[in-house]
Amino acid sequence: MSATKTSLYEQLTESSAAALAVKLGLFQSKSTLTCREIGDGNLNYVFHVYDKENKKGLIIKQAIPYAKVVGESWPLTIDRARIESSALIRQGEHVPHLVPAVYYSDTEMAVTVMEDLSHLRISRKGLLEGQHYPNLSAHIGEFLGKTLFYSSDYALDAKVKQQLAKQFTNPELCNITERLVFTEPFLDHETNDFEEELRPYAEKVWNNSRLKEGADELKAIFLNSAETLVHGDLHTGSIFADEHETKVIDPEFAFFGPIGFDIGQFIANLLLNALSRDGDDRQPLYDHTAAVWDTFVKTFSEAWEKDCLPSRRHLLEDTLKNAFEEAVGFAGCELIRRTIGLAHVADLDEITPFDKRIERKKLALDIGAYYIENRKELKHITEVLDQFKLRVKE
């Protein structure tokens, strides 16, 4: 699909979104509906349509053909809406309790109609307020273990996988990730964004040849290792949760990539939240980091034993070893890019006072660099956490 809208594309409004829900038969025509645009992202409009009388709601998400923050001078493919709805449906085949149900999708209108999750909160916001989400890591570990196994070479016949990979060809959004995660933060690039007090530490990143070689190696893995269907943007802002329930959303960056990518991104975002905390308040994040890896290994291994193709059955140990090494490296890239790159996170940017924020951002750069440079030496998740704790003392 073109990067710009097709002739059938029409941008929804609150009134036309509500009318669409009725037209689809998701509400009765006599229902009294409210509709609010609630999206806080940069790439989509998100409408919450609600029938107060019957206490029933749904979400209508529409991709827009440009980045809101820039406007129409930065066109974006609306095919990402098809990618997102297809990924949610695929993920729902294996973990229906961990993703929103998709009720309807329209490729031309770039619309996905899905389950209302307004009873949950974005996990990043809750974590920043000190919530623990006791089931978060177990749920995400299960999500990773099942979704990453069942779309891989280890579970699928080669022809089936090739057809699936074609369906999830996602060049524009992969290019965004390549630039913002693996390239621009490691150069003195105009898109980078950081406090002037961090410049000497950013320059340390840019002048570290070993670190840049590591980032280039990880970029090559990201671009060339089409192991499985990955979410592509799995951070704490892409997860709704409460104390009991977890739902992974926003897989519009989905593509066939390395098993370790989603794992590394999620772990890095747990550690970014740990950097926003002090002392013993970090322990829940350490627990989540260990638990998500351990649960992933358990779930992935169980699926492997049950459903791995016979010709690949002997490869489990090597597959997990490579996934761990790459996840550590990808986590390092995520820590660095969220500190000095274009797209920041509130976990770091809302730390007060200012001097403390700068110190924590220095730590993020230091830890990220260590993970990239030493990913082959770190063999267990406890070693990853030990190196983090060694640097974060107060």
Curated annotation (Swiss-Prot):
UniProt KW keywords: Amino-acid biosynthesis, ATP-binding, Kinase, Methionine biosynthesis, Nucleotide-binding, Transferase
A GO BP entry: L-methionine salvage from methylthioadenosine
Family annotation (InterPro entries): Aminoglycoside_PTrfase, Kinase-like_dom_sf, Methylthioribose_kinase
Spans traversing the lipid bilayer: none
One Pfam family it belongs to: APH
Amino-acid positions noted as binding substrate in the UniProt annotation, renumbered to this chain: D233, R337
Reactions that this protein is recorded to catalyse: 5-(methylsulfanyl)-D-ribose + ATP = 5-(methylsulfanyl)-alpha-D-ribose 1-phosphate + ADP + H(+)
Known EC number: 2.7.1.100
Amino acids binding ATP: N44, K61, E115, D116, L117, D250, P251, E252
Pathway(s) annotated for this protein in UniProt: Amino-acid biosynthesis; L-methionine biosynthesis via salvage pathway; S-methyl-5-thio-alpha-D-ribose 1-phosphate from S-methyl-5'-thioadenosine (hydrolase route): step 2/2
GO MF annotations in UniProt: ATP binding; S-methyl-5-thioribose kinase activity
Coiled coil (UniProt feature): none
EC class of the enzyme, as a word: transferase
Function according to Swiss-Prot or TrEMBL: Catalyzes the phosphorylation of methylthioribose into methylthioribose-1-phosphate.
Stated family: Belongs to the methylthioribose kinase family.
Subunit structure of this chain's protein: Homodimer.
Descriptive protein name: Methylthioribose kinase
Species this chain originates from: Bacillus velezensis (strain DSM 23117 / BGSC 10A6 / LMG 26770 / FZB42)
Lineage start: Bacteria, Bacillati, Bacillota, Bacilli, Bacillales
Gene: mtnK
